[in-house]
């Protein structure tokens, strides 16, 4: 019991002591004096140095001693509280030492076994390494011996092939290609047995290359596909096909650049004139004033030679490309053209043509910038330059077609190994344009600056005669001679431009601008004052001037139309361009004559309206004497029209144009005459006879206004059809086949009002309008429906009037008018 109690008391004290110590430790940790010792980067020397510099060293030492004492107590308490765990850890350490000793023993045994294995493996390994090196050297020696044997054999075979000449050249190239392969990746220098052979092979390769180059040049020059194919096969066997073809094309490009420079060299062009007088230092080569013609003659001769050179070079390059396209290697069956373009390189003809066009553009630009004489020659005689280009293009197309014929399957079967006949057509750049590249446009792009300058000068040449014949302040239109001068200038410009369709179109646009300028100048001469449209007295000065302007416009229109018709190579677009401009001339003629036409039409209408001032209500004459053949207004109308045609329109030289405009006046006059004739109320039998005579005379009255009265169409037929209706009954009038077809229903119903009693008023009477105002209303309402509705209103008003007076019946003509109205309304639906 005592022992148990003591144990419990010790444990209790230990627990309470631990709590006290924990609190003490916590106090130490929170104390600034001890907190520095917890830092990971605590340095004893630094701490000591700081403590020495402080004044109270004794206090710090005492503080540290106190802290050490407290920590010792804490450690003691920890050991007492965990003494069983600590004893267990100590026992485990002893066991671990035993395990480690056992592992050390086993590691020693393993090391001994490894040493024994090493002694058994090292010796065989060294032997294997030695044998492997020996085998590798043997293989290298065998490979070298095989190469030497093959080189000796091929060298001997090559000697025989070279003795065979051009017939064996492709085989010689194949042998050389194999010899090159044997020499790759190995150093054969210093081997005496093949030293002479290697020298021979180098000389043979050079000889074969030279022979192949000569064969290629000769074959391309004579366009012999067999020779070209043989040479290409040689270079293919040598492995230099692509490099050789590129070199050949580059050579053609360089030669053409030299030709362009020589053709445009001013010193060469002026050499004859400069031979007598040597230019000093810094003096430019320029043509003397008297030698400009010789300079230009030499220039165009050089240009023709340049075009010949370009054509020949293009033909040779195209021939080369076509052989490349058709030729296949007999062993690999690879088409040669595929070898050229396999790295994305374009076709050689495209490459060459692009280089040619760029060279032309750059050299032409630099040459004309440095020489004003060259620039003036190319700009002033641009059509000649363009003709050379067009001829070159035609020759290239023809040459392309001829080259295609040369490569027919029956002609060179040795070149057409497993290759479709049409495959090379896709390569024909001069006959089949690509969607993304136009070779003809690329060629002519070098001419753009000269074309623009030529067109500008051409426009000036076209404008100059017009500006001369229309001086500032001038009031008279051009004379016939002046118009002839303008026409000759237009003809000359179009004839010179006929060398090219695009140039013709561009010059046609200039001609159109010229015509428009003439129209603007002529319009400024037109008189727009009141006296320009008078039809009372003789021609005024303004009217005379307008007649002269219209006549000059007509002459120009006729002349230019003949010029266009005489151009055999005119395109539809170019012709349409000029004809559109001529339409402005025609429109201006119409505008110039329109005021006079309007005055004539107004005067005719005013005369026709006066028919209502005459009395048509009389009965037929019983004396047997013939009545007046026609009314007074008709005589006045005939006299007026005859006078107008004689005094005004006779002076116009464009009769067809005048009749085209006066025929409309004649048609209008007939329509007004019939309209007003249908409004006459009352109309007696004698009035009908006189009105019938007026109808007959109306044909004669409008005769001067047209070529033939029958050409007036519907108006003339209506005039002829209406006259018999004057004497027919209302029923026959309504049943006439002319009603609705030739004569509008509204006119017939309007005419039937004349046969009705006064109570049935005409529409204008009901509205209390004058005849002139009613006629104006009809002009403002051309719709037949509007006119019929107006007539229906008059009939309905009549019905209301009858009913309002309690009438028992309607006028006999009323049902006929209603029937016609219903028929007319039905026809409109």
Curated annotation (Swiss-Prot):
Q: Quick one: a GO cellular component term?
A: Golgi membrane
An example GO BP is: Golgi organization
Q: Give the way it sits in the membrane.
A: Peripheral membrane protein
Q: Which residues carry this modification: Phosphoserine?
A: 166
Please give the function described in this protein's UniProt entry: Required for normal Golgi function.
| Protein's name in the database | Conserved oligomeric Golgi complex subunit 5
Q: Is Glycosyltransferase included in the keywords of this UniProt record? A: no
Q: Which Pfam families match?
A: COG5_C, COG5_N
